[in-house]
UniProtKB/Swiss-Prot annotation:
InterPro entries: Dimethylallyltransferase, IPT, P-loop_NTPase
Protein's name according to its UniProt entry: tRNA dimethylallyltransferase
Name of the gene this protein is made from: miaA
Similarity comment text for this entry: Belongs to the IPP transferase family.
Keywords, ordered alphabetically: ATP-binding, Magnesium, Nucleotide-binding, Transferase, tRNA processing
Ranges for region Interaction with substrate tRNA: 42-45, 166-170, 247-252
GO molecular function terms attached to this record: ATP binding; tRNA dimethylallyltransferase activity
Subunit structure: Monomer.
Residue numbers marked as site, Interaction with substrate tRNA: T108, R130
Organism the protein comes from: Salmonella arizonae (strain ATCC BAA-731 / CDC346-86 / RSK2980)
Amino acid sequence: MNDVSKASLPKAIFLMGPTASGKTALAIELRKVLPVELISVDSALIYRGMDIGTAKPSADELKAAPHRLLNIRDPSQAYSAADFRRDALAQMAEITAAGRIPLLVGGTMLYFKALLEGLSPLPSADPEVRSRIEQQAAELGWELLHQQLQEIDPVAAARIHPNDPQRLSRALEVFFISGKTLTELTQTSGDALPYQVHQFAIAPASRELLHQRIELRFHQMLASGFEAEVRALFARGDLHTDLPSIRCVGYRQMWSYIEGEISYDEMVYRGVCATRQLAKRQMTWLRGWEGVRWLDSENPDRARKEVLQVVGAIAD
């Protein structure tokens, strides 16, 4: 698409960044001065009843700056990148039709990628094939199935841990159904996003600062009642650690503590470590991201001004 035809497309803003970088605070400030509506791009914030451990915006913040695609699933339900793309496109169309600009804010980079580039033509899940894989796993163990994936698709096997049955099963299922590897298929993109997108990433200037922010926020969550929140989920009886919701960072570690598998101190240590690892993965995505403008989260006023310099003209 050439620059002229791109300029005729409706506008959108992406505000990306690692966890604890100040994305939400900046988005709320931007909404005060720009004709934008916020759409959450976060695979944890979609869940109801998971507020403290996901650092969900407070009731006051949401009143001042409503976020779409928040609290749209029960923790027992799945939500895919395809689900997100469908829902986000519908919300973006609605916002644009009202004469405003969609501002998509979050840290789930897979969702941003799916929205921007479209989805690979992966086959739909097949219960029969999935059942056969699970039966094999029960007989032989997931470790052996991971070795099988290494032979079929070494790139996917390097990315998927043997203790991640959901993703391991899906990679094998895709091959058994289509005859093509997950790596082959994910290199084929779908429909590109029909918007002129201005992309920003916010993060502290140093890794040490980000680590400090992560540790501080985890302790703030604990002080705000995170344990009670997870105990309420645990008490339901229908949730478990194979679900994406309970595998969210912080929740998985607190779950292990509640089950008596680890001590409280170990839970805190693992929770902070897991959050840092998540931030590292997010930063790896962002460093390879094309067309992104970087903002310093340690200087929020300057970050806001930089966005306004770029976006102010398109918002007039």
